[in-house]
Amino acid sequence: MDQITEFQLDINRALKETLALVLAGGRGSRLRDLTNRESKPAVPFGGKYRIIDFPLSNCMNSGIRRMCVITQYRAHTLIHHIQRGWGFLRAEIGEFVELWPAQQQTDKESWYLGTADAVHQNLDLIRMHDPRFVLILAGDHIYKQDYSKLLAHHIARGSDCTVACVDVPREEATGYGCVEVDNDDNIVHFLEKPANPPGIPGRPDRAFASMGIYIFNADFLYEILESDALNEASQHDFGRDIIPSQVGKARIVAHRFSQSCVYSVGRREPYWRDVGTVDAYWSANIDLVSVTPALDLYDADWPIWTYQMQRPPAKFVFDTDERRGMAKDSLVSAGCIVSGGAVTGSLLFNDVRVNSYSSVIDTVILPMGDIGRHARLTKCILDTGCRIPEGLVIGEDPILDAKRFHVTEQGITLVTPDRLALL
């Protein structure tokens, strides 16, 4: 058996010995009213998915079938979604998605103090699965990544911990945890939101930003988490405390996202989005309606798995010059009825009704929206269940909109049922 085949067999074994932990307890306060009822990982995205589906699908498609989701803030919607949409795995052959709600499992009287504390409080559950490797993932980013390539890099380098990194312009890196590497991509410094991010060797105008994705050797992870838990000065966070404390002591290596990204057809720019603001959320959704979006949801070789509701096909009715049900340059999901209204450059989630003579332009409408007759919407996000009154105009007068709704710096208007009730 040649060396390449032996190495591949070792990776296949390693995938089965890997436990993925998805940190899904974040509130996502910068999304404002979109997270009033549910955590950020449970927020709908892309017409039919929830954000949590992306890291879970990456695990599934990469061959990692042992997944645990750590929840905390307003977890009911997230738990309900995973129970309905991710129950197809076969527990009898070691496949599962387990839900780990915050339970104060240690002697601390607080909930999770940070990302590292969330993992530390579940060490007993992790040890029960006896993993060789632990893959730690953020549950609130949109991207497609082959974790088997990340794991192969970790094993080949003999790392204690591997940090997945995406290169970004240096001027944009100040909002991220940044890593400084040597010529072999060994991490020599880890800096949380630095004012002057270090450049990449050979590319001084770019910086490595941590993606919040880590692979640890399990025994190494147990040791450093137990030590960190005793440190009263620590914030118990992987980016702020755990990784910086081990740089120079353990073998901490950077993994370039470009080496494991699942690319869209015809594109060589890695796609990774933190949709943590209203503007970023709108932009990432609206990008999907373009002819060749940066994120390919139509890739049958790397499907995004989710709960599939039983809904009828979308329907478009009425066809006269003044009353035509139509959509162009848009995504329209199952259960929608465009009844004599016009939809342009927009994304409609399931069960949205667009009534006659209305206009929807550059707008994201979450499930069960109803757009009244003669209403006009431009550059909006409508939260779940919004019912737009007949004749209401949003997105054309920013001063008036700001008095009634939240308007972002980029001019996106966030509309919610609670704000509509005050009109």
UniProtKB/Swiss-Prot annotation:
Keywords tagged on the record: ATP-binding, Carbohydrate metabolism, Glycogen biosynthesis, Glycogen metabolism, Nucleotide-binding, Nucleotidyltransferase, Transferase
GO biological process: glycogen biosynthetic process
Classification via Gene3D superfamilies: Hexapeptide repeat proteins, Spore Coat Polysaccharide Biosynthesis Protein SpsA, Chain A
Positions bound to alpha-D-glucose 1-phosphate: 112, 177, 192-193, 210
Leader sequence residues: none
Classification via InterPro entries: ADP-Glc_PPase, ADP_Glu_pyroP_CS, GlgC_bac, GlmU/GlgC-like_hexapep, NTP_transferase_dom, Nucleotide-diphossugar_trans, Trimer_LpxA-like_sf
Pathway: Glycan biosynthesis; glycogen biosynthesis
Superkingdom as given in the UniProt entry: Bacteria
Ranges in a coiled coil: none
Catalytic activity reported: alpha-D-glucose 1-phosphate + ATP + H(+) = ADP-alpha-D-glucose + diphosphate
Molecular-function GO term, any one: glucose-1-phosphate adenylyltransferase activity
Cited SUPFAM superfamilies: Nucleotide-diphospho-sugar transferases, Trimeric LpxA-like enzymes
EC number: 2.7.7.27
Entry similarity comment: Belongs to the bacterial/plant glucose-1-phosphate adenylyltransferase family.
Subunit-structure text: Homotetramer.
Function comment: Involved in the biosynthesis of ADP-glucose, a building block required for the elongation reactions to produce glycogen. Catalyzes the reaction between ATP and alpha-D-glucose 1-phosphate (G1P) to produce pyrophosphate and ADP-Glc.
Protein name listed in UniProt: Glucose-1-phosphate adenylyltransferase
